[in-house]
A protein has these predicted regions:
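Single-stranded nucleic acid-binding surfaces, predominantly the OB-fold ssDNA-binding core
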Residues: 1-124
Length: 124
């Protein structure tokens, strides 16, 4: 899945760039609207260890297979939903672009575009 990065809003910036390994199978579900949403976990390695990050994608995401190394560009969102115990929340990265790292030029392109948008925002 690859899509364009939305233009930077002047009210603030919410930008995530992840490069890591998919650690859970993709879970796809059909929403009430009829649209498909998919989710998976990706692990990154930091100075303090491995961090697992939940990722949500609009539509199907066939490239997110367990063990695949991906570049994800998106934003952080906290969403609320009803569960058996009441209202629950989940914080996740909403992916705007997902590219396998075996396509390094394409991964570099989406990351560079996101960083250029950030740079433009910081210059204003």
């Amino acid at each position: 899945m690859s899509s364009s990065i939305a233009a930077v809003e002047t009210a603030g910036i919410n930008l995530v760039i992840l490069v890591g390994e998919v650690t859970s199978p993709v879970v796809s579900r059909t929403l009430a609207s009829g649209d498909t949403a998919s989710s998976f976990d990706i692990a990154t390695v930091t100075e303090t260890g491995r961090v697992s990050v939940p990722v949500a994608v609009a539509g199907e995401c066939d490239i997110a297979t367990v063990g695949a190394e991906l570049c994800v560009v998106g934003y952080v969102r906290r969403r609320f939903f009803r569960s058996g115990t009441g209202v629950t929340s989940r914080t996740e990265v909403v992916a705007e672009s997902v590219v396998p790292m075996r396509r390094r030029a394409q991964a570099r392109k989406i990351a560079t575009r996101a960083l250029e948008n950030l740079s433009e925002f910081l210059e204003t």
